[in-house]
Amino acid sequence: MKELGLKSYRFSVSWPRVISQDGKVNPKGLEFYSNLVDELIKNGIEPLVTLYHWDLPLWQYKKGGWLKKDIIDDFAFYVKAVVEALSDRVTYWITFNEPSCFLMNGYMQGVHAPFKHRYLALPKFTKIFMLTNRRAVETIRKYAKKKPLIGLSFASGAFIPNDESDPKSVEEAYNKSFNVTMGTMNNRWW
């Protein structure tokens, strides 16, 4: 990565590798990520940590996953463990990678795990997700050892105008990129 000239590197921490089924922190899991952060910094590469990239622990799934409020406290416990281990060296935190994908595709369209078709559950899992994200942000701010910069990573697409000199073509590309992609794929709720 250093030879390629990368200035930053985004990676995801695996919740099931950090928190065991019995709710205990796995020191070896955290050590792996701590070593990764050290190596990145040693090579002049800024670490960007993603806390959730669709890897719901099996034990959490069995408790109900994104349809049960238990996930709010469980995720906050995981976030606290990661932040306490890495925040002395990490500034950039992404709470969730592409929430529309794991929620809409997993719980409505059934094309991603857990392959559910629960259209009527949309308000419920959306609310639980938003509360979980809020708690994650609060947890990062509370336990971070240096001032954190926090955000979400959204799924999106980019459209290029057919003719960059034509304002109508530029506007059409913009609308497809932001109003359709960001509005439909990510839903204004996120």
Name every feature range the model reports, one short phrase each.
Residues 2-7, 16-190:
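Non-catalytic scaffold segments within catalytic domains of secreted glycoside hydrolases
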